[in-house]
């Protein structure tokens, strides 16, 4: 017999431990752009882009306001002849005669002053609210666009006239006035394009990393 021989049966193996729920591991995902580091040269170039755009926009707006504000031309015409003596009258064209041109000068002057002020504030490293600056950039861009559009409509009327309303063109008599006004309009539209680029760059930098 086994008991008599001193042999003992091995104890049965212990029952398997109940399976516990697998521990959930939480992994934190970091944005893909947080690990990317741009080189210092690229960072400096990216930081320099808004400054260059703003400076160019201020220069374009200031040039447009100055050229339009100084735009004036006189034209002398014979209106009657008394005997052998002609009677002449001098006509003068200047920007203050047209409300659209006055608005154009004011809008461009405001845009130039605003951009210069923002550049000076950033140069002195004072704290400025970025959201406020972005909103003001959009307001100034809209102001520039409306001023340029209003002046362009009046410039087209002065160049081609309106046959139905019997408004004769005036650029055939005030050619220099119209040419300088056209140069001011071109500078203003350049300022609008630069402000648009500045707003797009600001939106891209705010949405990106």
Curated annotation (Swiss-Prot):
**What is the predominant subcellular site recorded for this chain?**
membrane
Q: Name one GO cellular component term.
A: plasma membrane
**Keywords associated with the record:** Cell membrane, Membrane, Transmembrane, Transmembrane helix
Residues spanning the membrane: 50-70, 101-121, 135-155, 181-201
**Residue ranges of region Disordered?**
1-39
| InterPro entries (alphabetical) | CASP/CASPL, CASP_dom, CASPL
Topological domain spans for side Extracellular: 71-100, 156-180
Q: Does the keyword Transmembrane helix apply?
A: yes
Cytoplasmic side stretches: 1-49, 122-134, 202-209
Disulfide pattern = none
- Entry superkingdom: Eukaryota
Assembly mode: Homodimer and heterodimers.
Q: Which family does it belong to?
A: Belongs to the Casparian strip membrane proteins (CASP) family.
Q: What is this protein called?
A: CASP-like protein 1B1
Which species is the source of this protein? Zea mays
